[in-house]
């Protein structure tokens, strides 16, 4: 339940794509799927094409009026209100400030979701494991390709 915060200028599709590019630049190798609500910013063609066609990331949508389908996200949004109360204007907020808040949120243990572990620690462990699997997969794929080429000779 790692939290990443990216400042979005507006809900316009071009601003969402720009914000997602920053997110993907930072965390792309760790992203396999996205589950979004049904906000207009997540259903624009520009955003859909960028995420699904260009990045090849599966995008899922929660059922309307079913916030429980994104329970962890709703919980983290409530926690974010400790730093930015509802109604706060993000006009003067800088990305650096959001990075600091995300770092603090990721350092706090999550009793239910992670059995008291800190999201940053779990994220790092999972990311390292994922990289090992990815390297093993690439080696296996390369070996199979070489075997196929040898069989063709």
Stretches found by the model and what they are:
Residues 1-6, 61, 86:
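Short small-residue beta-strand/loop micro-motif enriched in glycine and branched aliphatics
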Residues 3, 15, 42-45:
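Short acidic/glycine-rich loop or secondary-structure boundary segments that cap or lie
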Residues 5-28:
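Active-site beta-loop-alpha junctions of metal-dependent nucleic acid enzymes
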Residues 5-6, 33-37:
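Short catalytic-loop micro-motif centered on adjacent basic/acidic residues
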Residues 11-12, 22, 50-57:
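Active/binding-pocket-proximal capping segment
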Residues 29-30, 57-58:
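Loop/turn elements at helix/coil->beta-strand transitions in domains of secreted/extracellular proteins
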Residues 36-38, 45-52, 59-82, 91-103:
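RNase H-like two-metal-ion nuclease catalytic core shared by retroviral integrases
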Residues 86-153:
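C-terminal domain-tail junction helix/linker
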